[in-house]
């Protein structure tokens, strides 16, 4: 008791010290929501806010008195994680010790039951697994007795009891306190010890005293995490000393050694300690040698193993495990017990110098003593943590001597100890992976005989491999799922990963640190060395450098031991043990361990197979065998876990991540896959030892992270393999932890988040670009996604290097991983990435490898956007399976990458090879399929390269989801699950689409089908879409249609992320809309930046050559405009696409203003390149697409002019349908539309025209593509509008010039719109990425027309100014006509010719238009178009008839919403017009917007022409898809409506005759006007219905960051809400930042909102609505209180519901100065609350009968003497302004007496961010 009490007290002291460190200096409580000041002091957020609010002057830091401001405060997630972990550790401590931290050392009865053992194990306190601990504590009591009995029997039989006693005496000095802090790990460890509980308990009995002594010796060190290292050092030295003497007394001192080693290693499991002691004894000599190198590590492990917490929790574990072990032993109790005795005997023998000698000699041959010792120690530490590693180590050491005996022993000990850690450790100790595998198998399924035989057989092969110890270790690690030593070897990487995770400070990580602090820390150090050394060591192992290999192995073992414990802690009781094993197994072993944890016996069987595999794998790993790869692939298909494990066996370092992914995925199918995995492993062991092949396969299987690792390891070079192994192990460990958590039952969301955090770090190393980007931990989600993508990309690169291997791996991954658990796998990927990031050195090496594969690194500029690209890259590697593809991929990688920079192919930096290989080498096989079906590429990958395809989808899905929702990881996980199905559908749809290229109608039908399917799997498709996009970018050089499909798929992911419905439609559209339909689909996605993807795809396809050149130039030229777009694009998954579209539109607009034809031509080139970048422009051969569109046009209209107009209209219509994405593009595209229409008339118009050519053109385009009938009706409407416009403008030429001006202005507006859209998109997904993307888009576009773009931009700016002036005038006219719904009718009717022309177009377009309209109707984009701000839309609509921009005006009712919204407004206007045409409801909505008077006549015409189709589309559009469309931007620039009118004409001209400027000027102008008129007509209806409803919500934001503001802007656009900068009477909602409890900070808008009875809504409403893709109920998100007045005063609700004014009957004078609020705002608040405000002090009189109040802010006064004078003069109450603010906050009049200046010292609280 004394020992245990002392050690517990030490731990308690440590916890108290940590608690003291983590307490807030202000409230003296544990920090909550910590914020750091500039002086680096940490305080509670609310404490600081309260402090800042209460101080009159500048606030000072309470500690250093430095000045602090609210703006200088920065959130400290690290400290919050620390505090959270501390709370968890404390809870675990209380659970383990049964005493309150504050209640001294009172043990619970449960603890007392295990008191003796605790005394013995006093050195071990496990704070891990506090959840399962509750369950285990009860188990410990009975379990202890049982364990005692069984241990007594077994130990006595083995002579261990005696040795245990001696050890107790000997070891006390070495005892250290090992605190396992990992919550889940502890549980898992406890569970595992159940397996090893017999031995562990005995050993614990022996070790507790020794451990306790050591703990006492090093109690000071134990107090801190670092102390454990020191203790470990001492302990290790002592252990080594003890072990050396113990060697002399094998049996007696074996326990001692076990204990010292176990203590040093982790002293968690007595059984493990026993076995480990034996194994450690043989290793002791080596340990002594290793100690020098790994002293710190060992000390760490020892300390942690010694920590009393571990002993306590271990006892619980052992008790619990004992039962488990007994159960497990039941099947072969005799065998197991016998083997156990044998194993113990063997261990003792092993401990004997002879045993040590044989074992060591074997180990020495395989692994040098130093390496062996360090490995054993690490394994032992891991065992102590897991509760079974110790036993396993000894068992494995013994196995080296006698494989058969060892196998039985391992089986028994593994069964008893949990077998997971034991076996691994034994394997690590024993250079015989075969033996270990057999032992594990026997232990798992109590097949001792089999195991023994296998161990004997494989043991020999393993011994043979012993000559190359490191490779053997690697092989073992690869077979780690089966072979524990392998796990141990990989553990160093795992530890590293854990360390990184620790840096992330995830709660579990923190706990893990405590639990496996010693193991992990030292291993981390070692790992870093090992990681650096491992590649070399691996090479050495290849060269038979046993010593180095052994060292690496020991390092790995230590790391693994740490990692498995982490896993165990993470997983619940039974799963905990298994999971800890999986963690210790590192990446590959992790999978097996996870399986064993979930299904211990099954998992063990897996391990057996794994072990078998590992045994042969180790020797074979040197000899890569392609046949084995194929076999492995098949096996992995059978069980991805097995495949992954095999891969990891073959590729220890390179495939660690892959095992993680597979492991995580496997747990779900644990039972199912256990045997198959075993089988596969065996096969692999025998046939698939080639590391390269297995690595490649494993990498592909890993899908995201594994492939990455594969890349390096895929190459046979040992160094590279070693490096990647390290990386892989680290990554896999993180992934495993994540997967373990998920599997263990931890909240998937939580796990995902944690893993994401880690991943963000680890991914950096994996990706070329993400390496740089992922380094930042700030954007954890974004970085994670990006990293995931990068990992995928890297994997693909590896695949390119080893195409053969890649192919196999891809197939395996596709069938196994895809089916298994995409979400889990994704989480693992994140974790792995995190780990990888941590391996800076490994990361560097890996990056170098990756860069070797992908020579083009320009995507580094777009690190964040790369995450999607990386996802794409993942799919690319599948294509790169063939060597020629790899070579071509590298060549085209640069071009494709540049093109993809914007289209997220940048993430494919490594993947860029994919587009290229797809185009050239893979084009033949994969690319052709891709081109055949844009969606097919993903499906193609799936079928041909299943693994990569699934991986790519996962990554993409992640990206899209990340952008889609605040919790992208969860979404991405879900997306991954869906993607396989969706992709399957997509494949079919794409195939049908490809076949239907000739038949547009068929394509449209397919699109419909795909649309429906895609809606179901919108997210999935979104993810796959980006992948497809990448592939299609490279693949569809020849096939523009294919490109279109690719872009559509690309478009789909953004839409999907933003809106499931849109995404779904978008995806099908991409497949079906070869020309027009593709455009439509892109338009649907355009709002979400699907356009960006489409454009990127097109660009990469058609403009690859100039893309590289144009990336930078375009960026420079369109930098300003496109930056906005970039934000939008980045926001979306397909950010680049959207960005590029915006850029293209802008450039085109700038070109088109004066030289329309010339601009159109140059723009067509730009568009082609942009199309490569954006999926919309993926018709990169716009000529091909154009012909298709021309065919449609020819069908649509008889007259060329009308045809052009209809084309414009048709294109505009689909664009509108496509979404607001098109709108912002459209504004830029006004002039560019001509070029784009000609070159990429279908695709680009689809994506860009909707935005480019105002609402008119978008509607035209939509009509043509969406529905020929719609287009015809539009055309007929077009003509009247054009006449109206000509009437309004005076003449068509004037109107055209006006249009040009408008188009220029619209380009500018589009820039704004694009900026806003991108910003919003990027806010949701990743704004940073969007920035880069926009640059890329610009640069790509600029490649062909940099000068032209620059000139056009200048012209656009000039025209924009002009347009703004004109629009001001137009707005005035519109306002005048605002009340006249028939304002436009005269002009429409006035153009009978135009009307006639429209009918001509109508019949021609009816067929195609109908199909298009249906598709468009399905597309939510139409709704988006109509969702432009009503007010501006109305104004612009009125304006439009005059300026030809009515529709645009209608589409732009959101100028109030924001400049961004305004910018998109013009494009959105077009989209809305299209939508309106498609659906009268949209028209109605638009009508109220502001063009009711002017556009109602048009509405009538448009409705009549397009009534039914529009009606069909309206419901869909009204469904909220319009949220994704950028309608708000349209409203921003009233000039854009005119531009819209012009754009349709120019678009038609571009599409049909690029050089027909004259026609475009006249007929096009007329057509444009007509279109505008039609759109106006349609728009009013839409506006009246839907937009009126949307108009009900007018929002302002307060206290939000720029990113959050952009998110709100996107949110407003998507749901057609109004977003303004200031609170007005029309404002209904104030969006404010709050905490989880909806408590906000007080801002000026907060006060004004309450005063005005507005909804004060948390920003969470926006986030959640975006995540759930629907407008949630605001009531659930209403602010409840503020940090000053109270956290739940319900003031906002009270103000809304109150019908009486708060300050009614008061006459108030506000006496300046006021520091944080303007006087007029304060007066405004008072007036809103019913007070009578006087401007002059003398005006305060009692005649009115009102109460007189003078509001002052004493803290702002320089002279106090003024206050009494004023009070006396006015005879009014002198009240502090806090009374107004506090009363207003709670909307209750506070007692004036408490705020009277006469009664208070002037200390007022000032509102925060009053200007916000």
From Swiss-Prot:
Zinc finger (RING-type): 24-65
Enzyme Commission numbers on file: 2.3.2.27
Tree of life domain: Eukaryota
Annotated SMART domains: BRCT, RING
Compartment(s): Nucleus; Chromosome; Cytoplasm
PTM note: Phosphorylated in response to IR, UV, and various stimuli that cause checkpoint activation, probably by ATM or ATR. Phosphorylation at Ser-971 by CHEK2 regulates mitotic spindle assembly. Phosphorylation by AURKA regulates centrosomal microtubule nucleation.
Region (Disordered): 165-198, 321-362, 492-581, 640-767, 864-899, 947-995, 1030-1056, 1147-1185, 1205-1230, 1244-1289, 1313-1343, 1437-1547
A Pfam family per the record: BRCT
Pathway: Protein modification; protein ubiquitination
Amino acid composition bias (Basic residues), ranges on this chain: 165-176
Phosphothreonine modifications at: 1350
Residues found modified as N-acetylmethionine: 1
Polar residues: bias regions: 321-332, 352-362, 538-556, 702-733, 758-767, 947-972, 1151-1166, 1255-1279, 1333-1343, 1492-1504
Ranges of biased composition (kind: Acidic residues): 1175-1185, 1313-1323
Function (record text): E3 ubiquitin-protein ligase that specifically mediates the formation of 'Lys-6'-linked polyubiquitin chains and plays a central role in DNA repair by facilitating cellular responses to DNA damage. It is unclear whether it also mediates the formation of other types of polyubiquitin chains. The BRCA1-BARD1 heterodimer coordinates a diverse range of cellular pathways such as DNA damage repair, ubiquitination and transcriptional regulation to maintain genomic stability. Regulates centrosomal microtubule nucleation.
PANTHER family referenced in this protein's UniProt entry, alphabetically: BREAST CANCER TYPE 1 SUSCEPTIBILITY PROTEIN, BREAST CANCER TYPE 1 SUSCEPTIBILITY PROTEIN BRCA1
Name used for this protein in its record: Breast cancer type 1 susceptibility protein homolog
